[in-house]
Amino acid sequence: MIEQGNQVLKTLGYTENSKKHAIKVAEHAAEILKITGADAHQIELAQIAGYMHDIGNCINRQDHAHSGAILTYSILKELDMPISDRLTIVTAIGHHDEKTGTALDPVSAALILADKTDVRRNRVQNPVIANFDIHDRVNYAALSSSLEFKTEKKIIQMNLELDDSMCTVMDYFGIFLERMMMCRRAAEVLGWRFKLVANGSKLC
């Protein structure tokens, strides 16, 4: 389902949402919860949600968070996962898209932070730079991105280095403002604060 969904996105010209993205999000969601003090069970649920969060793309990019949540529920039910755990996972998946979702609990918060901060050049699937849309340009311009945890101040900071010949810092902030506000809310749910630093400039 993950690879079929990514093939759909590639055909439509969207950025990569393959197993590589799924694994990265699962790992980072687990790391976020571990550092912010969640228990082992919540960390495991976040890993599952992170890995499965984009399977709805195999149906349609539009509303993929909700269709993905429904698919995930069916899969986890077949595996006899307790209903409370199923609901935690599908709620996180159903709320990971910035158009319709928000962080509601630690698992959904970790998923949002891990997903929305996965910005990197090799997520661009369009081979022709001249045909890049604005999202392609932003991802292609990302020379490096990382999350830094300032535990004493309880700050989760995204550090981003951009090639400003492709995309300026303000271009990035303008395009991804909705996502960054979503990350801020997610950090607040965890009892932390979210900061974005791009090319050495604090943006939020």
Residue spans for each PLM region:
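Short alpha-helical hairpin
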Residues: 1-7
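N-terminal low-complexity or amphipathic/hydrophobic leaders
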Residues: 8, 24, 28-32
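Divalent metal-dependent catalytic cores for phosphoryl transfer on phosphate-bearing substrates
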Residues: 10-11, 21, 35-149
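Class I (Rossmann-like) S-adenosyl-L-methionine-dependent methyltransferase catalytic domain
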Residues: 14-17
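Electropositive phosphate-/nucleotide-binding environments in soluble metabolic enzymes
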Residues: 19, 23, 177
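Aromatic/hydrophobic pocket-lining residues that form π-stacking "cages" and hydrophobic walls in ligand
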Residues: 29, 110, 183
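Terminal helices and disordered tails flanking the catalytic cores of nucleotide-processing hydrolases
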Residues: 118-204
